[in-house]
Amino acid sequence: MATYAVLGSTGNTGKCLVELALQQPNAKVHAYCRNKTKLTNQLPIIIDNKRVEVFEGSIYDVDLFVDCLRGCRAVFLTITTNDNVPGCHMSQDSVRTIIAALVKLKKQQGPSGTIPKILLLSSATIDEHLNRDMPGWFKPIMKAAASNVYDDLKVAEQMLRAEDDWLTTIYIKPGGLSLDVQRGHKLSLDKQESFISYYDLAAAMIEAADDVEGRYDMKNVGVVNANGGARFPPGTPMCIAVGLLRHFFPWLHNYLPSTGPA
């Protein structure tokens, strides 16, 4: 019986992870969120579900994370944002708390305990191998449109790689994402594709976590479609445009709308 911790369970990826994990017989979910009411409104299937335990609280609460991560096979770290927030540090803060929690959990469990794998949701845009086929004119636009988010992810990755002598991390790096149905996916160490549905991304993350051979451990992993691409998200042009404004004119941040791929 596998138990998965989903950190960021109210986000698009997090919600899909919870749904797909619960489709597995006997699988359990530890869902972390900052607002339980928001989570239950978005995912009513978890209400009174004995296979789901919700952990509500601050991203800086180490003891809460210790309880959330205890007994888990894998930790899906999906705490991020679609907005190019100046000075974004959500991923760094999450990783810092996770590492502190796992250090504490390791001490509590002793040498016989097991530490869960971490699957960090990152981006193919910051992987020059996976994104090598991205049009040369478009790549700098994307890097600027989400520059603050990518800088945050880069630091988070560095923090996790610095602990690779005792922590196993899988770096999931999809291309563009879409609110679409699940069509089928493939994991790849060589390619990425846009657009991927959030459901296919979630399924790919679960597959990587469950791989008994550890083929994806400590690697950058792309996701490609197996049965046709996801639809183009109509919110993408606005998301890019507003992201560029936040990149070049960060003082405009509070006056700009929140955007997303929908």
UniProtKB/Swiss-Prot annotation:
Induction, per UniProt: The expression of the dibenzodioxocinones biosynthesis cluster is positively regulated by the transcription factor dibT.
Source species, domain of life: Eukaryota
Protein name listed in UniProt: Oxidoreductase GME11367
Leading EC class: oxidoreductase
Record InterPro entries: NAD(P)-bd_dom (IPR016040), NAD(P)-bd_dom_sf (IPR036291)
Organism from which the protein derives: Pestalotiopsis microspora
Pathway of action: Secondary metabolite biosynthesis
PANTHER family in UniProt: FLAVIN REDUCTASE-RELATED, OXIDOREDUCTASE MDPK
Keyword DNA damage carried by entry: no
